[in-house]
Amino acid sequence: MVQINENYLKLKAGYLFPEISKRVNSYTQANQGSEVIKLGIGDVTEPLPNACINAMSKALNEMGTHEGFKGYGPEQGYEWLREKISKNDFISRGCQITPEEIFVSDGSKCDSSNILDILGHDNLIAVTDPVYPVYVDSNVMTGRTGETLKNGTYQGLLYLAINEDNNFLPEIPKNKVDIVYLCFPNNPTGATITKDELKKWVDYANHNKSLILFDAAYEAFIQDKDVPHSIYEIDGAKSCAIEFRSFSKNAGFTGVRCAYTVIPKCLTGQNSKGDKVDLWPLWNRRQCTKFNGVSYVVQKGAEAVYSSQGKKEVNSLIDFYMENAKIMRNKLRSAGFTVYGGCNAPYVWIKVPADMTSWDFFDHLLEKANVVGTPGSGFGLAGEGYFRLSAFNSRLNVSNAMERIINI
């Protein structure tokens, strides 16, 4: 009989968001007619920008002609899109990232997991706690951790607690780690990092020859001018960091699927003999073998994000969601909740009442207010006692949800 990958058996009972869906479905089936407002999963709700729709429609029509038809595209992405990304997202901020260092993909969730394909199994890995679950689960699936401990953590991972005491910023490890995942603006806490704090991480990584996997999926929501949008704004980052970006949240591409990963040409690892090995060719080889590229139509939609109309419409979407976050933050604070985040990220991170766990509060909001959020403990041990609410919803739903919560 075929042998399975037993690492999957180490995973917790269910991925966080399917578990939430399971509980919500159970509640709605038992309470027919309940109008549940979902502020849990960070999925967008507003329509795509017209600039993107028009560009994709034009591209689709092109595909219906012999002259305009496109088959397999380049695995790295079309050069015209990578040039726009390089110019608008990096060169404009003083980051010398070339189009050749950009790999277009169908999602940063996929890339942050798939990057492990080119990294060895013996690396010591650090993650923040709480953390986006994909970072942990993908390492478990590929056998890079030990067994599950009683507290829900995994042997072999170094957990860096982020909480009120350290302003939700992880402390630099005292010892060497090989790989560290950083996400800023942070999911789930909504916290940001300053250039000075990020420089400490870059210096640490270069000193220890470590690799930073930097998730910048929410950079477009940054409002403060002194908050870095890219790790490459920091001197020395190109020699120690890979950055993940996405069109999902800023341009509403969660159902369209387009993202990109930056791997600088100067970034290196080493083999078992201690010889330096460039990471760019390894990732390029991986993509050429396992990925057929993002469709021409979708990439044309992504290119339109950088048009003058596209920029205006994307900014309008971001302003809409950030106004939602402001409403949530202000309403919850007026009701006596301690609230973090929501200033440079589309998430608010609230402390739950002292007599409740995160899942207790989840059930409380679901049953008493018909509002769904995400229990902080689902993001890690240090998330216990907190709760995440997403600003990705309609203005009416956000306003109604806040009124329901404060009137419980």
UniProtKB/Swiss-Prot annotation:
Its EC number is 2.6.1.83. Transmembrane segments: none annotated. Substrate binds at Y15, G42, K109, Y132, N187, N292, R388. It catalyses: (2S,6S)-2,6-diaminopimelate + 2-oxoglutarate = (S)-2,3,4,5-tetrahydrodipicolinate + L-glutamate + H2O + H(+). Its cofactor is pyridoxal 5'-phosphate. Pfam families: Aminotran_1_2. Pyridoxal 5'-phosphate binds at Y72, S108, K109, Y132, N187, Y218, S246, F247, S248, R257, N292. CDD domains: AAT_like (cd00609). One of its GO terms (biological process) is lysine biosynthetic process via diaminopimelate, diaminopimelate-aminotransferase pathway. Keywords: Aminotransferase, Pyridoxal phosphate, Transferase. The modification N6-(pyridoxal phosphate)lysine is found at K249. Pathway: Amino-acid biosynthesis; L-lysine biosynthesis via DAP pathway; LL-2,6-diaminopimelate from (S)-tetrahydrodipicolinate (aminotransferase route): step 1/1. One of its GO terms (molecular function) is pyridoxal phosphate binding. It comes from the Bacteria. Involved in the synthesis of meso-diaminopimelate (m-DAP or DL-DAP), required for both lysine and peptidoglycan biosynthesis. Catalyzes the direct conversion of tetrahydrodipicolinate to LL-diaminopimelate. Homodimer. Belongs to the class-I pyridoxal-phosphate-dependent aminotransferase family. LL-diaminopimelate aminotransferase subfamily. PANTHER family: AMINOTRANSFERASE (PTHR43144). This is LL-diaminopimelate aminotransferase. The gene is dapL.
